[in-house]
Design a protein with these regions (language model features):
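Short glycine-aspartate micro-motif
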Residues: 2-6, 66-70, 176-180, 186
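Short glycine-rich, Thr/Ser-proximal phosphate-binding strand/loop in the N-terminal lobe
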Residues: 3-44
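Short, well-ordered amphipathic alpha-helical segments that serve as non-catalytic structural scaffolds
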Residues: 48-60, 109, 159, 278-283
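Phosphate/pyrophosphate-binding loops at sites that engage ATP/ADP/AMP, CoA/4′-phosphopantetheine
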Residues: 53-67, 166-169, 283-294
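Short beta-strand-loop/turn "lid" adjacent to the catalytic site in phosphate-handling enzymes
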Residues: 57-103, 121, 129-141
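Glycine-rich phosphate-binding loop plus the immediately following alpha-helix
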Residues: 105-112, 124, 139-175, 183, ...
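Adenine-nucleotide phosphate-binding core of ATP-dependent small-molecule kinases
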Residues: 237-291
Length: 295
């Protein structure tokens, strides 16, 4: 079976081609803030990212012949983890999603490419809205704002299964804390194959990341909302997109930040240390959900 895999992220587009379990092509195309800023909305990147996929296939001499196409799942309605075929209902949910992120393009691009091939289905797997939370984890300090979780379920569950295989056991038999470090950062508690707690890594919970603010002081955020300084859309971008490292240092490029630290940039060192500190604190907190008994 020949499979095309498409993973659009906030700072990259990952592309792979597999013949059964053998990788024939693996590419990770990085995108700068400037490159993506020409598109007013994430959905406007559809043709750009789709054409990147086609260009990579052509550049590497891979014929456009596949048995299945799978894309990163979008921010549809909350669902349990698993593999889902893209259908009209999923496309509608994705196009009218309450939140925007590049992952919304994954299933749409997969379906568009698959539809041009005979008998080729399009799938998504473990989208970022996977919801397996314990009920106690949903409760916040305000009944107006129950916890929702948007996290890197695809990568986290893949890593969990790989770790289980390395340990000669099953994901469903392990208790794990897993952290995804990318444009956004998510920390989740996996108990016997279910992610019973995870932060909302997209719009305002957990550690700050290369392009997201993470948890912010609620009072100061309210004051900023009513200050008249920023519009609603501008405020949202200060939480996700133009926040975190890019707000402090003007870039999401961690290797470049490390290089500037090596050259004596003390501000960059402090900001990067602060991100690492917050990530470590979140991992430690997640371990308490399992009473410290982490495999």
């Amino acid at each position: 079976m020949k499979i095309l895999v498409i993973n659009p992220g906030s700072t990259s587009t990952k592309i792979a081609v597999y013949e059964n379990e053998t990788p024939l092509l693996v590419r990770n195309i990085k995108h700068s803030v400037e490159e993506l800023s020409v598109y007013p909305q994430v959905i406007d990147q559809f043709e750009f990212r789709k054409n990147l996929v086609l260009q990579e296939l052509e550049a590497n001499g891979i014929p456009f012949e596949f048995d299945a196409v799978i894309g990163r799942g979008g921010l549809v309605k909350p669902i349990p983890g698993g593999v889902y075929e893209v259908n009209e209902a999923m496309k509608r949910d994705t196009l009218h999603a309450m939140r925007t992120h590049a992952c919304n393009l994954g299933g749409l691009i997969a379906e568009e490419l698959a539809s041009s091939l005979p008998h080729c289905p399009a799938y998504i797997a473990d989208p970022g809205v996977v919801d397996e939370l314990e009920e106690v984890a949903r409760i916040t300090g305000s009944p107006l704002m129950p916890k929702i979780t948007i996290w890197h379920a695809l990568n986290q569950k893949a890593i969990a299964r790989r770790f289980a295989k390395e340990q000669d056991t099953k994901y469903e038999e392990l208790d794990l804390v897993i952290c995804h470090l990318g444009g956004g950062i998510s920390v989740a508690v996996h108990q016997h194959g279910r992610a019973i707690d995870a932060n909302n890594a997209l719009d305002g919970e957990g550690p700050f990341s290369p392009e997201r603010a993470g948890t912010l002081p609620a009072g100061q955020l309210i004051d900023l909302c009513y200050s008249g300084q920023l519009t609603k859309d501008e405020l949202k971008k200060r939480i996700s997109g133009r926040a975190g490292l890019t707000a402090h240092l003007g870039t999401t490029d961690v290797p470049a930040i490390i290089k500037s630290i090596e050259e004596g940039d003390k501000k960059a060192e402090l900001i990067l240390d602060a991100m690492i500190y917050n990530v470590a604190k979140a991992i430690g907190g997640a371990a308490t959900v399992l009473c410290g008994k982490v495999d």
